[in-house]
Amino acid sequence: MGRSESQMDITDINAPKPKKKQRWTPLEISLSVLVLLLTIIAVTMIALYATYDDGICKSSDCIKSAARLIQNMDASAEPCTDFFKYACGGWLKRNVIPETSSRYSNFDILRDELEVILKDVLQEPKTEDIVAVQKAKTLYRSCINESAIDSRGGQPLLTLLPDIYGWPVASQNWEQTYGTSWTAEKSIAQLNSKYGKKVLINFFVGTDDKNSTQHIIHFDQPRLGLPSRDYYECTGIYKEACTAYVDFMISVARLIRQEQRLPIDENQLSLEMNKVMELEKEIANATTKPEDRNDPMLLYNKMTLAKLQNNFSLEINGKPFSWSNFTNEIMSTVNINIQNEEEVVVYAPEYLTKLKPILTKYSPRDLQNLMSWRFIMDLVSSLSRNYKESRNAFRKALYGTTSETATWRRCANYVNGNMENAVGRLYVEAAFAGESKHVVEDLIAQIREVFIQTLDDLTWMDAETKKKAEEKALAIKERIGYPDDIISNENKLNNEYLELNYKEEEYFENIIQNLKFSQSKQLKKLREKVDKDEWISGAAVVNAFYSSGRNQIVFPAGILQPPFFSARQSNSLNYGGIGMVIGHEITHGFDDNGRNFNKDGDLVDWWTQQSANNFKDQSQCMVYQYGNFTWDLAGGQHLNGINTLGENIADNGGIGQAYRAYQNYVKKNGEEKLLPGLDLNHKQLFFLNFAQVWCGTYRPEYAVNSIKTDVHSPGNFRIIGTLQNSAEFADAFHCRKNSYMNPERKCRVW
């Protein structure tokens, strides 16, 4: 072998020799065959590997989804012991609540990201902007113009005060200036009709619950200066908030007196503001608790204005209160005359009865101090820095935040809240994928079908009521993404804001203009038909909605993004995300409130007595379940199972419907490829993505606030409560019976 190779090599490098035909040796033939075989094997292996499907999705979208899920979860936690920790443990380790936020969650992160988009589109000058968009950008610039706002101090507010009968504590000789012309009817009405501020009496024009095509006047109990009536106990966990509230009043009164160069008597300021607190405590105690206001049938009390006067007589400053004069003071601002035969709806008869003895105890000065304060406290954040800073301790007591929200964020939200269609146009053009609309339409159709099919499973509901429920489900109208008109009909959009004209240097006046505009628009509706095609939300919103009076579900563009939805992410994630949200909103039509409205949106009892009784029995299971959860962040308080019932019913119904819809999808289309890096099947991924939507935490101060004011359960209990009731979840994660996440007793309504 060596000799032959040497000859070949030598031949190659030495002088040529006479040619003669050479034969391959057996060894050379063997080697050649071996090389050929190895080449064939290598090519075959490469071809097989290139086409080999290991069942793992390797697209960039799958990799992103997997990375997000892995980052958020704590795989070392036991899913059957605490699924919140399992799903969100990683998120909790990585995220800290910002100093400006009272809570932080995946929802809030999406909202933060949306606000960045709004900032970018609102601050970008474009010569081709339509008039409505130009106005939105002017309003935004006026809001972020801190130098102009600071240079004006409290002067814009001082200019406004005479229009609302002043603020006695911050005035000199109030009785002589306003006392002779002051009447309770005029003072309460002025705040309402011009600025939409409802103090002492909540008067508003809204849809008639029993005739949802018409508007009607409503009388209700007012909102309070503190988050809920419980705060006015002013002891224990509420003590700091009460102290900060009174100090806030005193600080603002002091600033206004200083600005007017009036003498300051600290004792007098303290005396008057503590009197306001006493009055507001009595009003708070007169209001009905939220858990006693959950039945819309009991809330609805229709009567004539004359009967209202007869049933609920009030006396202020020794004079009888005229409900007719009060009503006409408000409605005359939009040129509508109200006769005593006008029908109105009273939502709070108990409150109006209890209000009478309270009002007789207080002077016009006391009442005006309260009314003006409640308006002023809303406007403080629109004034110069020293006014804003007077709110710091109060904000900390209620929300736990040590810093104000960044100006640009606050302003982007303010403009979006007041010009939602103009801002929605900008957001949709910048960030919304139009093809999402059709995919979500299909998801809604699937989940609606599942809801109707599952009616057959309900043993507690009779056939007659099931038939009506099916009719209502089929009649639900959906709104997805945004109203087409905000893009296609520029004239309509411009006309919507025709009356508004903003100035960059006058942010405060712009705010007042918005208050007047929105209140006037609402009052004018009294003699107009309800526009049931009107959207109940703007497009640039990370949320979803159900309207009982319209029987309408709405999914704004802002929520149609991961983790809720993407046309390019696994369908298990879409069904666990936006699918669950769709089911949640559909179920709202049949929760403890929505079930009282028929397919046309009218407050009508369409239930048989037996089915209604059974519904209450089924619901009671969830009242107990959620009411037994204690929240450490809120000082160990129990959740309110009654106030959160509607949302809990919707969560439980939504997850069940979405899961069954996903099972139908798999039967039709086959199993999806698994996600890389996760040892989880798609049933498990469905529940994991659902849970991660609610990853988040609260500051203790806001937990105390939220447990009394939010109709939603905190995120961790939305996960735990819903999945404890899901046999499908227990099956997917192989949870043994009677483990924490798989209790023997499960609650189900829908």
Curated annotation (Swiss-Prot):
A peptide binds at residue 103. This is Neprilysin. It is found in: Cell membrane. The active site is at residues 585, 651. A lipid is attached at residue 2 (N-myristoyl glycine). Coiled coil: none annotated. Keywords: Cell membrane, Disulfide bond, Glycoprotein, Hydrolase, Lipoprotein, Membrane, Metal-binding, Metalloprotease, Myristate, Phosphoprotein, Protease, Signal-anchor, Transmembrane, Transmembrane helix, Zinc. SUPFAM superfamilies: Metalloproteases ('zincins'), catalytic domain. Inhibited in a dose dependent manner by sialorphin. Zn(2+) binds at residues 584, 588, 647. Its cofactor is Zn(2+). Thermolysin-like specificity, but is almost confined on acting on polypeptides of up to 30 amino acids. Biologically important in the destruction of opioid peptides such as Met- and Leu-enkephalins by cleavage of a Gly-Phe bond. Catalyzes cleavage of bradykinin, substance P and neurotensin peptides. Able to cleave angiotensin-1, angiotensin-2 and angiotensin 1-9. Involved in the degradation of the atrial natriuretic factor (ANF). Displays UV-inducible elastase activity toward skin preelastic and elastic fibers. Its EC number is 3.4.24.11. Myristoylation is a determinant of membrane targeting. Glycosylation at Asn-628 is necessary both for surface expression and neutral endopeptidase activity. Glycans are attached at residues 145, 211, 285, 311, 325, 628. Residues 2-28 are cytoplasmic. Disulfide bonds join 57-62, 80-735, 88-695, 143-411, 234-242, 621-747. One of its GO terms (molecular function) is peptidase activity. It is a single-pass type II membrane protein. A motif (Stop-transfer sequence) lies at residues 16-23. Residues 52-750 are extracellular. InterPro entries: MetalloPept_cat_dom_sf, Peptidase_M13, Peptidase_M13_C, Peptidase_M13_dom_2, Peptidase_M13_N. It is an enzyme of class 3 (hydrolase). The chain crosses the membrane at residues 29-51. GO terms for biological process: amyloid-beta clearance; amyloid-beta clearance by cellular catabolic process; amyloid-beta metabolic process; angiotensin maturation; bradykinin catabolic process; cellular response to cytokine stimulus; cellular response to UV-A; cellular response to UV-B. One of its GO terms (cellular component) is axon. It comes from Rattus norvegicus.
